[in-house]
Curated annotation (Swiss-Prot):
Disulfide bonds: none annotated. With S4 and S5 plays an important role in translational accuracy. Located at the interface of the 30S and 50S subunits. CDD domains: Ribosomal_S23. Belongs to the universal ribosomal protein uS12 family. It comes from the Archaea. The keyword rRNA-binding applies. Keywords: Ribonucleoprotein, Ribosomal protein, RNA-binding, rRNA-binding. GO terms for molecular function: rRNA binding; structural constituent of ribosome. One of its GO terms (cellular component) is small ribosomal subunit. The gene is rps12. Part of the 30S ribosomal subunit. GO terms for biological process: translation. This is Small ribosomal subunit protein uS12.
Amino acid sequence: MTGKKSPNGLFAARKLRRKRLKFRWSEREFKIRMLGLKKKYDPLEGAPMARGIVLEKVGVEARQPNSAVRKCVRVQLIKNGRIVTAFVPGDGGLLVVDEHDEVLIEGIGGPRGRSMGDIPGVRYRVVTVNGVSLRAILEGRKQKPQR
């Protein structure tokens, strides 16, 4: 007769809990969270937002079944020099953003910090341009200052 794999009884709780904790290390998300690997490889280094300089404007083709050119910019982050691609939201948003502008970027809000919707490889979006909100500029409330 084979033995039971898990203990049972009134005083088995500690043993059961320890066993569960041991098996959690085989889960990918748990391991990434506990070892702090997201901060290590994240261009924003765990911060919610980051400032950067626009290097160039790029058009990213949308994934199937959509057909569009999503307006994005290549941004070099000030704090560590890494280059990321950021989506420019809004109608005419790319007309406002020029090369060498200083922009503030944040996560685009995709699942588990990844890209969102049909934009492949783009994890960030532009929030402000030269210290002024992109939305305010597009709505006509404020003017973009010249750098």
